[in-house]
Amino acid sequence: MLIDFIKMHGLGNDFVVFDARKGPSLALSGSQAAAIADRRTGVGCDQLIVLEPSTVADAFMRIYNPDGSESGACGNATRCVADLLHRDGIAAPCMETVAGLLLAEINGNGICIDMGQPGLGWRDVPLAREMDTLFLPLEAPGLKMPAACSMGNPHATFFVADLAELDIPVTGPLLERHPLFPERANIGHAQMLSRSHIRLRVWERGAGLTLACGTGACATLVNAVRRGLAEREAVVELDGGQLLIHWREQDGHVLMTGPAATVFHGRIALESITG
């Protein structure tokens, strides 16, 4: 059986999107998702997205990491899905995830997603025990005392003087799986270029070092503001490009604005890849 998919990306953070809103349902196992995400023997992606019908939104987004685990949120994928829905004739797409509803606005600056309010408490992240999320007792070579929050998924942000001095492929997997994070964590590495310009690299939970991480950019601005390092609106520069992040003061919602692109449409014989 051939299944249609769309290959999309947001700042190089790439996705395989299956649209099962109107056709047959698509229930993937973790091993199937991992096989599709494999860049050598599958289609290849940072995350796999299955769109399902929703009773409260235009679509339900099920998000798989390349290791087959599920994620509660992905900012870049949400922009891609919003673009897809917008091209289907939906003016202001609304996406449902396990972390809640996400609203989109398409304008001349790109696709703006209301990512909702960050979770700032230790249970929100979550952490293994009660502590101040602004300064975690966590260290690695060149890294110490990150701030943590949740953007629908757990994030820890280290603020550093020079990103070039870090060995993220070595420290990233160790920090991601640190016992302090019972659900693992996305590990951000942020260099403050100014109060309105942040350079960021993210080791993503279940995906590794990616070209861009939308929720990571949101979490980094939130943590930078909490530390008194940034204004409430800033450009976050990732390896794949820039996002504009605004932590709105009146309601505490985080707004993320950036691009999305469709690369190609394809068909996959699921049984031939996953055996």
UniProtKB/Swiss-Prot annotation:
A single GO molecular function term of this UniProt record: diaminopimelate epimerase activity
Top EC class, one word: isomerase
Keywords of this entry: Amino-acid biosynthesis, Cytoplasm, Isomerase, Lysine biosynthesis
Site residues, Could be important to modulate the pK values of the two catalytic cysteine residues: 155, 204
Sites where the protein binds substrate: 13, 47, 65, 75-76, 153, 186, 204-205, 214-215
EC number per UniProt: 5.1.1.7
Active site (UniProt): 74, 213
Reaction catalysis annotation: (2S,6S)-2,6-diaminopimelate = meso-2,6-diaminopimelate
Main subcellular location of this protein, as a coarse class: cytoplasm
GO-annotated biological processes: lysine biosynthetic process via diaminopimelate
Record carries keyword Kinase: no
Pathway given in the UniProt record: Amino-acid biosynthesis; L-lysine biosynthesis via DAP pathway; DL-2,6-diaminopimelate from LL-2,6-diaminopimelate: step 1/1
One cellular component (GO) term of this entry: cytosol
InterPro entries: DAP_epimerase_AS, DAP_epimerase_DapF
Localization in the cell: Cytoplasm
Family note: Belongs to the diaminopimelate epimerase family.
Function: Catalyzes the stereoinversion of LL-2,6-diaminopimelate (L,L-DAP) to meso-diaminopimelate (meso-DAP), a precursor of L-lysine and an essential component of the bacterial peptidoglycan.
Subunit comment: Homodimer.
Name of the molecule in the record: Diaminopimelate epimerase
Top-level taxonomy: Bacteria, Pseudomonadati, Pseudomonadota, Alphaproteobacteria, Acetobacterales
Gene coding for it: dapF
